[in-house]
Every structure is written in structure tokens, then in C-alpha cells.
A protein has these predicted regions:
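Metal-dependent nuclease catalytic regions and adjoining charged, substrate-binding loops involved
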Residues: 1-8, 92, 137-175
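Metal-dependent nuclease catalytic cores that hydrolyze phosphodiester bonds in DNA/RNA
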Residues: 1-110, 117-129, 153, 161-163
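An active-site-proximal "capping" alpha-helix that borders the catalytic cofactor pocket
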Residues: 127-140
């Protein structure tokens, strides 16, 4: 991540939570890095020691981690569901990895949970690319057939009053 600052003097517990991110990506390249711009990936790797990020800028990532942890716990109670499992496949000597949020074996559906803004209510191309790589990884790991890809968006800035006023606005905080 580079250098982490705390210019707003946030409590040490928040700093510790941000720095205690267990995500490593695994393999040579993760699904999200694979679908990212090569230029962004190369420059980020080349200059990672020069990149400075403030703890306050990581709050939404922290919230996303919390949501994924809660959903993983819930998934443990469900039969025929794989949750938060990291998958790997070799591609020409590169170990590609990706983590599925929820794979429903019986319905052949792969769900990905995104904590996001209402401004992304229609999703993004990167979400579609990520789900397709995860679909491929699931097939490579156990031969799972996936016929449905689903993004479950959790809108951190949802406003019910806006939903009542505007039919094109998301009608629920989770869709």
C-alpha cells in the first residue's frame, strides 16, 4: 500500500483496523489486478514506496471488509454454498487467483457483494470482468458450472427520500 498516514488524528483502533487488512491477493496476480489497466498496475508496483494513503481514505474498504466477514459467517450455515473461498489456476506459468463471495451450487449462481455508491447503481464493466474471471476460476477449481452472475450492491449513501421522489434512483439500500 505504500505509506499510511493519519492526518486527521483518527483513533488508534481505526488505524489498526485499516493496517490489519489480511488480504494478500495470493498467487502471482489476482483477478482484480488482472482486469485492471496494465499501466495502473505497472506504475503502482514501480512507485508503491512513493504512494501515500491516509487512514481516512480507507474507511469504505474497511466497511467492505466488515460486510464480507458478516456475509461469510452467514454463508457457513447454508448447504450447497461456497463462501469467501480463494481459487487458483495456472495460466502460462502465472498463478491467477480470485475470491468468490458466494457460489450457489444448486442454482449455478455466482454472487459478488459490492459496498458502493448509488452513483454506480448500474454497475461497472470491471464488475462484469471480475465475475467472468471468477466464473472461469470456479470451473477450473472443481468444474463448477455457473449460469448466472449476480452483483449485490449495498449502497452506502442510499436515501429513502430520494427513492420516493425519483423512480430511477435505487429503490432499496441493497439490490
Amino acid at each position: 500500500m505504500g505509506t499510511l498516514t493519519n492526518i486527521h488524528g483518527l483513533p488508534q483502533s481505526i488505524v489498526d483496523a485499516v493496517t490489519n487488512d489480511p488480504y494478500t491477493g495470493g498467487g502471482d496476480i489476482s483477478c482484480t489486478k488482472l482486469i485492471d489497466s496494465p499501466r495502473v498496475r505497472v506504475l503502482g508496483g514501480k512507485h508503491k514506496d512513493q504512494i501515500t494513503v491516509d487512514v481516512s481514505e480507507r474507511v469504505w474498504a474497511l466497511l467492505g471488509q466488515a460486510v464480507h466477514t458478516i456475509l461469510e459467517r452467514a454463508g457457513l450455515r447454508q448447504e450447497g454454498v461456497i463462501t469467501e473461498e480463494r481459487l487458483y489456476a495456472d495460466v502460462d506459468g502465472w498463478l491467477v487467483s480470485g475470491q468468490v463471495d458466494t457460489l450457489h451450487l444448486a442454482s449455478e449462481k455466482l454472487s459478488d457483494f459490492k459496498v458502493t455508491t448509488v452513483w454506480k447503481k448500474n454497475g461497472s464493466d470491471s464488475w462484469t470482468r471480475q465475475l467472468n474471471v471468477l466464473r472461469w476460476l470456479a470451473h477450473k477449481n472443481g468444474g463448477h458450472t455457473i449460469n448466472t452472475l449476480e452483483v449485490v450492491a449495498i449502497f452506502r449513501d442510499f436515501r429513502k427520500s430520494e427513492a420516493l421522489r425519483d423512480p430511477s434512483y435505487p429503490q432499496a439500500a441493497i439490490q
